[in-house]
Amino acid sequence: MTVLKDAVSTSLYGSRGSNGVVMITTKKGQQGRTQITADAKWGAVSREVANYDVIKNPGEYYEQLYKGYYNGYRYNSGFSATKSFQLANNDLSKTGYQIYTVPTGQYLVGKNGKLNPQATLGYTDGTNYFTPDAWEDATFKTTFRQEYNVGISGASDVFSYYSSFSYLQDDGTIKGSGFDRLTGRTNVEYKAKKWLTIGSNMAYTHTVSNSPLEQDENSTNSSSNAFFIANNIAPIYPMYVRDATGNIMYDKASGNKIYDYGDGESTGFARNWMSMSNPLGDLTYNKTEYNMDIFEGNWFAKADLTHGFTATVRLGLNTDNSIIYNYNNPLYGQSSSYGGEIMNEQTRTTALTHQYLLNYQNAFGKHNVSALAGFEGYRLKVTDFYGNGQQIYRMNDYMLGNSTSKFTAGGTKNEYHTAGYFFSGSYNYDETYFVNIGYRRDGTSAFAKNNRWGNFFNFGLGWNMKKESWLQDFEALDQLKLRTSFGQTGNDNHNYNLATTAGDDPYAGWYAYQDIFKMTGTDGVFSDGTLKNKGNADLKWEKTNAFDFGADYSFFKSRLYGSLDFFFRATSNLLDFKQVALINGYSKIPINMGTVQNYGVEFEINYDIIKNHDMQWSVNFNGTWTKNRIHKLSSDYENGQYITGNRIYKEGESIYNFYLPKYLGVNENGEALYLGVKMNKDPETGKDTTPVKDEEGNYIEEATTDYDNAYEYNRKESGDILPKVYGGLGTTFAWKGLDFAIQTSFQLGGRIYDQGYSDLMTTGGTSFSAGHNFHKDVLKAWSEDNTSSNIPRVDFTDKYATSFSDRFYTSSDYFSIDNITLGYTLPKSLLSRIGIQSLRFYGSIENVAIFSARKGMDPRMSLTYVSSSWYTARRTISGGIKLTF
């Protein structure tokens, strides 16, 4: 695999190279006898990143919950200590469950704020027994993974072949999230004539993915999200229904455990927080299965013409047929109220690429010349249809025909086309001086006719300084090559930016220049068409102008080698959307928002510490320093800035710039303080009216407990939150058949909004809900015994305690150990006697560990914020054997 990042290389690939190009070279047969390779590995999969550091002791949770109620009554309502004590204990019932047996006439929490020592964990109402379960331990498991690969290859003077077969089975880290994949590939080349070579590279993949719904960033706070619930549910709730003696009850029909959904149906208790929720129950009784059949075919014919010319025709076909079966059982959970639900969906994706190339290559003494001209067309079509029904007749039958009422159906067809003409030429003199030029004209169906075509240029220069006579005597230097390039690439694929904000249409970006309407009607009669997505016929190509200047070097007989690069990229006509007033009939419109610049330095250093016949030891280190800023905003934005939600886009500042109130800690009563502005008062009511201004017309700042004041009048910019530096460090070691490798990565100097932590620090306001867990940092909150804390007091009436502010900016620095591998290859002298070329045993750990600012927070998941709702990185420990003969 080769990553192309320089301006000339990426420009040649047009819009699909706008974010860099990854070249994957598939295996081909090597001349000689047939070679067979077999590789098998087995392993265990678990979570790399644990949950946040939450309260896990039921009594400790009740003490904090009591404190929230007590402080609310005592400080805000003005009740006496005795009255507040009584009311707070009564409010503990808002959790909906009783899991402690408390002596008659006594309270669960005493006047000292501690759990009643006479209370015993476990409670029965005569029908069921209630005791908390460890939801995290029950939800996440260490599971099995196995993978097998077999390849056969060979070649002669006119024919080469490579075929492979692989199978992967992975059970996932949560129940019902397993993955099976079966793949076959064949790569064949045949020299049909002295002047003609033809080839075929085909692959077929079949996958079955059990992918439970609502386990990603699009289902934050979902009652079915196992990650969110395991992170956030209080440690006081049963996961299972138990009989009066404490034994877990089982469903007679399926033999599965009966799960407590907290809805008052299975038992007499109902949760206040996330009622009708039990993700493990959903994962047990419900099912979402994705079946995919993927075909990839690439064919070519290459003709060697006269005088250094070659002509090549390439055809590529990718098809993806997927079927989704979504089954929500009729007995338990949210679908039980309407007898269960089934959804079947089938999607067919077809991508066709055709390419025609004319290449010229020749040498005239020390002058080397090459040129390439070509045309490329690309067509993508996606068709899908779905059906949905309720009232399931048979359990565990996932087909739509098993539903008996409330049928709905729909379908869509979407197409996207591009075409491109391109030319590139290169010249070098004696492999010393290099010149590259190129041009590409791309067209797309994503824009209106008058904006569909874009022109993109590139050029590059190179100088192999080691070839100069005045460096020949510098024996320590093996290579020193300077290079610089400028290239333009276009981007029309704003599907992500637009579609993810346009509702439920994943293809909105393909038609962003058009107004899209949704038809409505009943019983076959059309009634109306409503605007679904507002288009913009003035949209045009997003264009990136990239400049690179760098050097490749090698010293000491290639023991020390690497590269150093400076890059500058300016992306103009950036494709995005603009929020508008709903009075227009729509909330957003796609636009070319302006110009964004990215610049920085990146380097790579490799050093062979030991390099001889028996032992090799090398280290590698790479890093990138980068900066981002908005150079110019579209005239659609007034005053050179645009505010949307908690983000601000402003000329001269980073595109990753938050706009939030500044948190100042707490006041003398433990209330959250923010930097707001001084307000004029109504003389009659005493209520705030308008901000007070100084002589220059600026607001006068002051600390306030009124979050709305700070949010409306005095939000502050965060500045660039992106990491300043990121990179990796690794080492490899080999000695007499033994090999060892370790690879790590890091990032420094950035910030991220820790939404997962914020959720767990909620101790008041509308977000405060009995049954929602707390982070252990809540134990450090302000109290009369801890007045130095900057964490607001636990108080259910403090509605501003965890509002959006810079309080929850957290360092996004991390260091991760990504991979450790240890292997041993048996000596060839031992294997040759039994006809084996190579035999290697190995073990590896992937995603070993990550060290970040807070337990449970993984800064790799996003550039802007992290949540407790996402399917986290997985650690895989495996061992295997690789055999070649």
Q: What are these language model-derived features?
A:
Residues 1-37, 145-147, 160, 166-168:
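A beta-strand signature from Gram-negative outer-membrane beta-barrel systems
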Residues 37-123, 214, 498-499, 505, ...:
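Conserved small-residue
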Residues 94, 98-153, 158-166, 242-300, ...:
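Outer-membrane beta-barrel transmembrane strand signature
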Residues 123, 335, 405, 444, ...:
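Extracytoplasmic gating/loop element in the C-terminal half of outer-membrane beta-barrel translocons
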Residues 142, 173-176, 445-450:
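Solvent-exposed loop/turn segments connecting transmembrane beta-strands
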Residues 181, 187-196, 201-206, 215, ...:
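Extracellular/periplasmic, surface-exposed regions of secreted and cell-surface proteins
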Residues 218-220, 225-227, 331-341, 520-531, ...:
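Solvent-exposed loop segments that connect transmembrane elements
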Residues 593-597, 639-658, 718-728, 760-776, ...:
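C-terminal extracellular loops and terminal segments
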